[in-house]
Every structure is written in C-alpha cells, then in structure tokens.
Amino acid sequence: MSWIKDQVILLTGGGSGLGLALIERFIAEGAKVGVLELSAEKATALAHCFGNDICVIHGDVVSFEDNERAVAETVRCFGKLDCFVGNAGIWDHKISLLDASPEQIDKGFDELMGVNLKGYILGAKAALPALTASEGSMIFTLSNSSWFSGGGGVLYTASKHGAVGMIRQLAYELAPVIRVNGVAPCGMPSDLRGAASLSQQDRCITDNLSLESLSAILPLQFIPQPKDFTGPYVMLASRANNRTLTGVMITADAGLSIRGIRQTTAGVMSPTKKESSDDR
C-alpha cells in the first residue's frame, strides 16, 4: 500500500540524479508531481517521459516569480499541493579559500547561496499558501556537507550548513500547520554541476569524486545510487507515517556520519598537503 497515493508534490531540480529518482518514486507510489526545472532540454524530456502524471515548469529557483508560477501551475494541473521538495542545487568542486580568488569568492558566494539556500527559501515562500490550505509539508535536500567539512569547498559547505538553520527556523515558524524536514544524502553518481561563476558549469560531481574512494569510506561499503535515497522523502511526505516529525534532518549517508569524511587531521595548508600539491 502506498504511503503517498493521491498526494501532489512539487519538486525543484528534477531533470537528473536524485531529483529524477524522486520523481520516479513519487509517481510509482501514486502521487502526482510538479517540477521546476532550469534546463529546457531536461524539462521537455520529463514531460515526454511521465505524461499526465507530471506538470513541468521551466524556470529558475532563484526567481520568486518562477517558484510562484510553479506552484500555480501544479495546483492548476492537479488541484492542490501536499508537499514541497526543495532539491535543486549546485556544487563547488571543493574549491578552497586558499585557491579561490576574491572575485571567485564574491561571485561564487552569490551563486551557491542563491541556488542552494535562497532558492529553498523562495520555494518555501511560494508554496506557503497552498501548503497552509492542505496542512502539508516541506522537505529539503541537505548533504553530508551540512554536518562535516571536506565534502565540498567553503562556499558549498556554508550553503548546506545554512540550510540546516533554515529548516529548524521554518519548522518553528510554520508549526503546527506545516511540517518541515530535511534529508542529507552522501555523495552519489549524478549530474550535479558546479557553479558557472567558478567556470564549473560543465563539470559534474563525478568528475571530481571517485565513487570507488567514496565506497571505501562508507561503512556500508557500497556506492549508493540516487534511488537508494528516496525512501526517507516518501516517509516524511506521508501524513499517516509522519505525524510527529518536524525540524528533523535524516542523515542518509550509508554510515558516513559514524566515522567522518576524512581520516587525516591535516588541512589544505599542512606541509604534507603542500608537498603533495607541489609534486603535481
């Protein structure tokens, strides 16, 4: 029996990776899905693939008007909104404070914070009236970088730490009507791109992240696929199975949090690291 049958869920960033896996899972569970997608090509592919089960809106999460339009179109297509999932994000390919120029920090900060944090807040604001009417929920995608250093650079890590505070504050503000939670996956093979302001827009996370090295540090010793992370979202969206959770962040990281990201205590400025860098 489905936990979210007949629900209507609006998701941001659904063209690939975790977002696409969530769409597939939600529809398989009997839900209807609205998607706000930046890529026109991916938006067209989604509409073609999922037909009447999906409402695709081409737009940008950093625009309140696009978020508002996504909510309106989803409600127009399916009559209501039960859950908003903030999922669109970009990475920084671990660019450090040491390596980033002042200009990169300035522009990269605006872009990373804009997509990864401002986009979540604007989506929440746009979805608020419809979710108030349905007494629904919000779910936001976090990261192991929401808790630990080393999973991204200073800009990405700051944006994901910021999302934790946002979830807690929204859970406080929107209770008792709307539940607000998060899911923090570890790394996975996906098309997660870097920031254009850092000239990383054509690089995806797997260009920088070795999946074999990821598997080696995960206590569960396997490479998680995007579909492996979808279960917590279904549970959090379910009214029957989640009456008590708000302000909760589920760490779905194959055990990474019980051992941390790095074994070494040396930072990027350590002599060992510098020698290794010089050798290259």
Swiss-Prot record:
Keyword line: Aromatic hydrocarbons catabolism, NAD, Oxidoreductase
One GO BP annotation of this record: 3-phenylpropionate catabolic process
Catalytic activity as recorded in UniProt: 3-(cis-5,6-dihydroxycyclohexa-1,3-dien-1-yl)propanoate + NAD(+) = 3-(2,3-dihydroxyphenyl)propanoate + NADH + H(+); (2E)-3-(cis-5,6-dihydroxycyclohexa-1,3-dien-1-yl)prop-2-enoate + NAD(+) = (2E)-3-(2,3-dihydroxyphenyl)prop-2-enoate + NADH + H(+)
CDD domains (alphabetical): BphB-like_SDR_c
UniProt EC number: 1.3.1.87
Superkingdom of origin: Bacteria
Tagged with keyword Cytoplasm: no
Alphabetical list of InterPro entries matching this protein: BphB-like_SDR, Dihydrodiol_DH_HcaB, NAD(P)-bd_dom_sf, Sc_DH/Rdtase_CS, SDR_fam
UniProt pathway annotation: Aromatic compound metabolism; 3-phenylpropanoate degradation
Active site: Y156 (proton acceptor)
GO molecular function list: 2,3-dihydroxy-2,3-dihydro-phenylpropionate dehydrogenase activity
Residues binding substrate, per UniProt: S143
Name of the top EC class for this enzyme: oxidoreductase
PANTHER family linked: 3-OXOACYL-(ACYL-CARRIER-PROTEIN) REDUCTASE (AFU_ORTHOLOGUE AFUA_6G11210), SHORT-CHAIN DEHYDROGENASE_REDUCTASE FAMILY PROTEIN
Family the entry assigns: Belongs to the short-chain dehydrogenases/reductases (SDR) family.
Role of this protein: Converts 3-phenylpropionate-dihydrodiol (PP-dihydrodiol) and cinnamic acid-dihydrodiol (CI-dihydrodiol) into 3-(2,3-dihydroxylphenyl)propanoic acid (DHPP) and 2,3-dihydroxicinnamic acid (DHCI), respectively.
Protein known as: 3-phenylpropionate-dihydrodiol/cinnamic acid-dihydrodiol dehydrogenase
Species: Photorhabdus laumondii subsp. laumondii (strain DSM 15139 / CIP 105565 / TT01)
Primary gene name: hcaB
